[in-house]
Regions:
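Non-catalytic terminal extensions of PLP-dependent enzymes
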Residues: 2-75, 91-131, 143-159, 165-171, ...
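TRNA-binding/sensing appendages of the translation machinery
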Residues: 80-97, 320-325, 764
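Short, surface-exposed loop/turn segments at secondary-structure boundaries that line and modulate
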Residues: 95-107, 200-213
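Conserved PLP-enzyme active-site core in the AAT-like
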Residues: 172, 202-370, 432, 436, ...
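A conserved hydrophobic secondary-structure block that centers on an alpha-helix together
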Residues: 183-204, 218, 222
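A structural preference for short, hydrophobic beta-strand core positions in alpha/beta folds
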Residues: 194, 249, 302, 441-442, ...
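Proline/glycine-anchored alpha-helix kink/cap motifs
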Residues: 208-216, 238, 395-407, 826, ...
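Conserved phosphate/anionic-ligand binding catalytic regions in large, soluble enzymes, centered on
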Residues: 332-345, 349-350, 394-398, 479, ...
Length: 1022
């Protein structure tokens, strides 16, 4: 009898958290070791029972995380012809890169139970000091409506779904993202907005690249006002290098007028970036500058604030071409840097160059309106090195939160929130000036810059529990938000009074001051900001004006959720996407205010908890990759690629090898690889892939030798994107090293490496990891993501830095993202996942993921062509099925994908990495019953194809060609050559539990030809 993998028979140590009861802490003197080798262990049973050691916790995570039960794993092994999991792994993972059994200590990462993890997470959270942060700088506190917090952020129906490439089963979140686009378009006054970007800094960088591209790359100067957010300026400088753009930072307001600097060649200006309101809080009339820039053929970019835009003129009204910013203050807390959804809106002339994902309206096969991703041919997975951006992951979940915030409050509610914030800022302005201080900015919305002895003011503020912005020794800044109360205003004014050596104002006096200023409740709604007052209407669409009670919004949220297939519904077998369990225990820390309410620029002595968690996660990831150091800053896999290549670029430049700019990339690589290489200023040279999916070493050697003096790097994904390990990865990496290049190992498929092999043993210099794949951060319907990089020791000095908090090495490159540690709040999820599994749990997860994929490959190999297998006939963690042979019967990849929806599944990855392929990945979390259900679906679809082949069904009118089938299609006239029952209940079990797609197959061509990217009434689309 084969038992659960040896990884489950490891010995782990119980570590009592500091906050545990005394009785638990007593175990420190006599450590308890968990012995998991006996048949009585709960991991080996369907139901937990007493183990040999009564002190062992029963809420261990591994047995909940792994889908197949031990007897089912034995069945899978027997089916595949193996007597043990170790024998299977030895035949799957190439020996030359396989980690020796004892290469990593059992105690390198000690597993905690779910309750121990919760206790440890709370202990760390309590080390973060809960001061009120009025720092601003693009990050503000917000009141998250509980109905949105509970039913979107904390709802697996929203956070476990994938990017909506399969539009028929994504109508709910597509509608919500369309609401987001409409919200941004309306408030910015521009013509079209995308469905979110990663953060404000990277959005501004995308705008800079768009402006550069609009001149066909002929103009190389991008002018930035000195009062743009400092982190944005740093991100721009880092991004500009690869494109040869010169970022010029200058004061663009002189003598009270906005104008271009005299010392910059006007003929070379591609665009200008201004902040509105600026970092100091000032509102500037940018219209004269806009006219000047446009007269030169340049592009004007405005970084702006959505809440302020409910009161001040929109960028579109004063002539901006692009508006970017952060929508976090619409119901998404700062999270020590994120995640929050950045927005990006453009004028009509730029709509086909807009980066990121774009939601549009099309129609389905029945002529009904339906939502879809529009203009997908712009995206990097299609255009590769010709793409204008490498953006892949965005911030869909957070964009949906912000959209729901706007839906809940509506235009009137948003205006009221903004007016209250502005009124409180006026009151603070008056009180501070009454104390003898001078406020530097005359026109403002929510931010003030005050001339003062900064050291004294900051000391007084911190003692009052308040953080202010560090501007200079002679100035401090403050920024108010919707969470501010009378108590906060009293404490804030009191701190300035204390610093001035004066008596503080009482709360009653502050209330009296508000009345003197005419700022009572009845007048706030009619407040205006002189000279900048917005008169145009916004958010007039029905969706923003009808769901203002909690019951209404709750039902609206759930009506959208019901239209989408998520992991709460079924398996999502997307190859190269790793849709594994996002456990409740991993997600719980995210909801704690000690994590999500922290400002990213809070003093480091106030965030000791975050620093401890970040340090532990960096250490764990270094252990897993075998590399020397890790940066958690990149907030997507694509950003990780750019970061890793930029680190390589900096290292080579420091060696004086600036001529090295060639990047060798296999033709089978994901499209982000060539797009990222181009962004990093490299020239892409493709390397051939052999018919068996392996890299052609002869071609690699020839091209590495040919470009020996110019070779900078190679980018290789291991296992390959075709679903197999490379047999000679060490040899391939040595070829590159021998010719002076660095090896970038794309971590997209790290799922098949963890604790079995690693980038270091293969010889990689740098890798990125997708925490939203391998380490269980949810995909969120298209983001958030985290893409940290690990580097070898020689690259450590070049890890990304930051202008506010020092990160990275002594020769740090410019920041990749706006926040020092990226989307820090969701690092808690990956940290929890790793800590609950421990080293051996991680190993077991990888083993079972490999096993599940090979089981599916074995079960369907006689019905479909499994395109690639490894040396011993196995695949890695995913399998590529080639359905080209069915085209002669009129059946395409997309036909099979849509038919799988009728069986209750999300389709696999379609038409990639080959156009006729289905890339299937089965994670370790999927129950054996669900795996069997998928196998049965493929078997029955093969039978349906056989009926077409035999002439029993016409090629153009069958259950595959007409899939997916909706309830509406059943209730109408039925003239199809197959029964309704076969259409929607191809297996009996679907009668008891069926996911019904809300629309039939969508017409993509019609949607792109008739581009509509904002919401309205259904009648408008008909």
């Amino acid at each position: 009898m084969v038992t659960f993998p040896s990884a489950l028979r490891a010995i782990s140590r119980v570590r009592a958290p500091r906050t545990a009861p005394l009785s638990m802490n007593m175990t420190r003197a006599m450590p308890i070791r968990r012995t998991l080798a006996t048949s009585k262990d709960p991991l080996f049973l369907e139901t937990p029972n007493a183990s040999d050691d009564v002190f062992q916790p029963l809420d261990t995570f591994l047995r909940r995380h792994i889908g197949p039960r031990p007897h089912e794993i034995n069945h899978i092994l027997k089916t595949l012809g193996y007597s043990s999991i170790d024998e299977f792994v030895d035949q799957t993972v190439p020996e030359e890169v396989r980690l020796p059994k004892n290469a990593v200590s059992d105690d390198a990462i000690v597993a905690l139970s779910e309750s121990e993890l919760a206790s440890r997470g709370g202990e760390i959270a309590n080390k973060n000091k809960s001061l009120r942060s009025f720092i601003g700088m693009g990050y503000n506190n917000t009141t998250v409506p509980p109905v949105v917090m509970r039913n979107v952020l904390e709802n697996p129906g929203w956070y476990t779904s994938y990017t909506p490439y399969q539009a028929e089963i994504s109508q709910g979140r597509l509608e919500s993202l369309l609401n987001y686009q409409t919200m941004v378009k309306s408030l910015t006054g521009l013509d079209i907005a995308n469905a979110s970007l990663l953060d404000e800094g990277t959005a501004a960088a995308e705008a800079m690249i768009l402006a550069h591209g609009s001149t066909n790359g002929k103009k190389h100067t991008f002018v930035v006002d000195e009062n743009v957010l400092p982190q944005t300026i740093s991100v721009l400088r880092g991004r500009a290098k690869g494109f040869g753009i010169n970022v010029v930072v200058r004061p663009l307001v002189r003598d009270g007028n906005a104008q271009l600097p005299a010392d910059v060649s006007a003929e070379d200006i591609s665009g200008v970036l201004v902040q509105y309101p600026d970092v100091n809080g000032s509102l500037v009339d940018w219209e004269p500058l806009v006219k000047e820039v446009k007269g030169l053929g340049g592009t004007v970019v405005a970084a702006t604030d959505l809440l302020a835009l409910t009161m001040i003129r929109s960028p579109g009204e004063w002539g901006a071409d692009i508006a970017v910013g952060n929508s976090g203050r619409f119901g998404v807390p700062p999270g020590f840097g994120g995640p929050q959804a950045a927005f990006f809106a453009v004028s009509d002339s730029l709509k086909r160059r807009i980066p990121g994902r774009l939601i549009g309206v099309s129609r389905d096969a029945n002529g009904r309106p339906a939502y879809r991703l529009a203009l997908q041919t712009r995206e990097q997975h299609i255009r590769r090195e010709k793409a204008t951006s490498n953006i892949c992951t965005a911030q869909a979940l957070l964009a949906n939160m912000s959209a729901m915030y706007a839906v809940y409050h509506g235009p009137v509610g948003l205006r009221r929130i903004a007016a209250r914030v502005h009124a409180l800022t006026r009151i603070v302005h008056a009180e501070i000036e009454a104390l003898g201080y001078h406020v530097s900015n005359k026109n403002f919305f929510d931010t003030l810059t005050i001339a003062a002895n900064a050291e004294k003011v900051h000391a007084a503020a911190v003692s009052a529990g308040i953080n202010l912005r560090h501007v200079s020794p002679e100035h401090v800044g403050l920024s108010l938000d919707e969470t501010v109360t009378l108590k906060d205003v009293h404490a804030l004014v009191g701190a300035f009074a204390q610093a001035a050596g004066k008596t503080g104002t009482t709360s009653e006096q502050i209330v009296a001051r508000s009345r003197e200023l005419g700022l009572d409740a009845s007048s706030v709604d009619t407040l205006e900001i002189g000279g900048f007052n917005r008169t145009s209407k916004y958010l007039e669409q029905p969706v923003f004006n009808k769901y203002h009670s909690e019951t209404d919004l709750l039902r609206y949220i759930h009506s959208l959720q019901a239209k989408d297939l998520s992991l709460t519904t079924a398996m999502i077998p997307l190859g190269s996407c790793t849709m594994k369990l996002n456990s409740t225990s991993s997600m719980q820390l995210l909801s704690k205010p000690e994590y999500h309410a922290v400002h990213p620029f809070a003093p480091l002595d106030q965030v000791e908890g975050y620093m401890e968690l970040i340090s532990e996660l960096e250490r764990d990831l270094a252990t897993i990759t075998g590399l020397a150091a890790v940066s958690l800053q990149p907030n997507s896999g694509a950003q990780g690629e750019f970061a890793g290549l930029s680190v390589i670029r900096a290292y080579l430049d420091a060696k004086g090898e600036t001529q090295r700019n060639v990047c060798l990339i296999p033709s089978s690589a994901h499209g982000t690889n060539p797009a990222s290489a181009v962004m990093a200023g490299m020239k892409v040279v493709p390397v051939k892939t052999l018919p068996d999916g392996q890299i052609c070493l002869d071609d690699l050697r020839a091209k590495a030798t040919k470009h020996k003096n110019e070779l900078a790097a190679t980018m290789i994904t291991e296992p390959a994107t075709v679903g197999v390990y490379f047999n000679k990865s060490k040899e391939a990496f040595n070829i590159v090293h021998e010719n002076g290049g660095q090896v970038y190992l794309d971590g997209a498929n790290l799922q098949a490496q963890v604790a079995l092999t690693n980038p270091a043993i293969m010889g990689a210099d740098v890798t990125h990891l997708n925490l939203h794949k391998t380490f269980s951060i949810p995909h969120g319907g298209g983001g958030p993501g985290v893409g940290p990089i690990g580097v070898a020791a020689h690259l450590k000095p070049y890890l990304p830095g930051h202008p506010i908090h020092a990160t990275g090495g002594e020769h740090a490159i410019e920041p990749i993202t706006a926040a020092p540690w990226g989307s820090a709040s969701i690092l808690t999820i990956a940290w929890a996942y790793i800590r609950m599994l421990g080293w051996h749990g991680l190993r077991t997860s990888t083993q079972v993921a490999l096993l599940n994929a090979n089981y599916v490959a074995d079960r369907i190999k006689d019905l479909y062509k499994v395109k690639y297998v490894g040396k011993h006939g196995n695949v890695a963690h995913e399998l590529l099925v080639d359905v080209a042979e069915f085209s002669q019967y009129g059946v395409t990849v997309m036909d099979i994908a849509k038919r799988l929806i009728d069986y209750g599944f999300h389709p696999p990855t379609c038409s990639w990495p080959i156009s006729t392929g289905l890339l299937i990945e089965i994670t370790e979390s999927e129950p054996f019953s669900e795996i069997e259900r998928l196998v049965e679906a493929f078997r029955l679809i093969a039978e349906e194809i056989q009926e077409i082949k035999d002439g029993k069904l016409p090629k153009d009118n069958n259950m595959i060609k007409n899939a997916p089938h909706t309830i509406e299609s059943l209730t109408g006239e039925w003239d199809r050559p197959y029964s309704r029952e076969r259409a929607v209940y191809p297996v009996p079990a679907l009668r008891a539990n069926k996911f019904w797609p809300p629309v039939s197959r969508i017409d993509d061509v019609f949607g792109d030809r008739n581009l509509v990217c904002e919401c309205g009434s259904v009648e408008e689309y008909a």
